[in-house]
């Protein structure tokens, strides 16, 4: 199981009550690291998983308000993870990320209830704004 936990709250970001937890599922370690750092710099706690199955096992016993989810992973696609989320935890907000421009996949996941869809590399400010908006809706 690949799990990275980032628990520091930055003092510049007191508006996030008790440091919101953002879950991140991506099979690329460098992407997990960079997005974890970005979210951490904005005051979020990050729980990052390299394997979708490990995330699904974790969420079976832990509430998840928001997950940032890679759409194309080797063992299970983000769309398959979304199907599990819709069945188990329909209130969970999902932001999809991908390294490949795929408008059909974007349309599919947005229609299925995703909060946002970003193609890597993405604008950090827009991404953080989407994270905050998704958490406000959760």
Where are these regions (language model features)?
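Active-site T/S-Asp motif of two-component receiver
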Residues: 69-70
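Acidic catalytic/metal-coordinating carboxylates
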Residues: 50-51, 77-80
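Receiver (REC) domain active-site loop signature in two-component systems and cognate sites
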Residues: 73
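Non-catalytic signal-transmission and effector/linker regions of two-component phosphorelay proteins
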Residues: 1-23, 29-36, 125-138
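A Lys-centered signature of the CheY-like receiver
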Residues: 120
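Acidic, metal-coordinating helix/loop segments flanking the phosphotransfer/catalytic sites
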Residues: 48-66
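Alpha4 helix (beta4-alpha4-beta5 surface) of REC/receiver domains from two-component response regulators
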Residues: 80, 101-116
């Amino acid at each position: 199981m690949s799990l990275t936990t980032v628990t520091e709250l930055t003092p510049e970001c007191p508006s996030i009550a008790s440091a919101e937890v953002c879950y991140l599922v991506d099979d690329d370690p460098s992407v997990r690291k960079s997005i974890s750092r970005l979210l951490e710099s904005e005051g979020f706690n990050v729980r990052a998983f390299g394997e979708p199955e490990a995330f699904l096992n974790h969420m079976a016993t832990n509430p998840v308000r928001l997950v940032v989810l890679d759409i194309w992973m080797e063992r299970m696609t983000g769309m398959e993870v979304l199907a599990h989320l819709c069945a188990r935890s329909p209130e969970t907000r999902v932001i999809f990320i991908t390294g490949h421009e795929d408008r059909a996949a974007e349309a599919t996941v947005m229609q299925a209830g995703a909060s946002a869809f970003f193609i890597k590399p993405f604008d950090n400010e827009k991404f953080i704004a989407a994270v905050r908006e998704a958490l406000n809706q959760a």
